[in-house]
């Protein structure tokens, strides 16, 4: 009983320690810049490629998804090239959706094989305290935000809720809606449990669109907070999504960020 209570208290109030990966041997590359400064390869090449593939996929899915739902325009002149506009939008949406799902599966895989900054360990000690202090930091309140080189607690929480969960809901409901006309097919036999959880076709559309809007909100907030972090902390947050490198004091980069 005492150990359970202690673990709970450590999780809420303990020292910040949620940047450790499932594989502690995979430490990030570090380069000494002198004068007490260093840079660390936070985002490895596979993560950066995934980031940009994912970004482009979401943009395409947002546009085509809105068109499928609202059909906000149509061809002014019916020609061979324009008369199938909705069909083209649906085709692009479906192809991009499979790219999005493949990227999601790869990112889950890389969580286990990448460096220490590729994971989102919201169960680590001190996570709740770090989350609250990060919220205060972003809304300009006095705070004791723990020093982090990778994702801070708020970013990790947002990834879990608005990206991780929403992506899974989008993938499951999207797959079912795609294969729904093919009753009796192999894929429908695999996905038969989906309406039991999410409801009929109408409710599935609502779940799908709700998760899509959640992803859009996350994306806007993510871009704003990344620019804000880069401006306030000046650690190369924005340039790191191209180069992978972030800059900090050497004592933090070599593994003392939890102190």
Protein language model features and the residues they cover:
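Membrane-embedded alpha-helical bundles that constitute the cytochrome b-like, heme-associated redox core
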Residues: 1-259
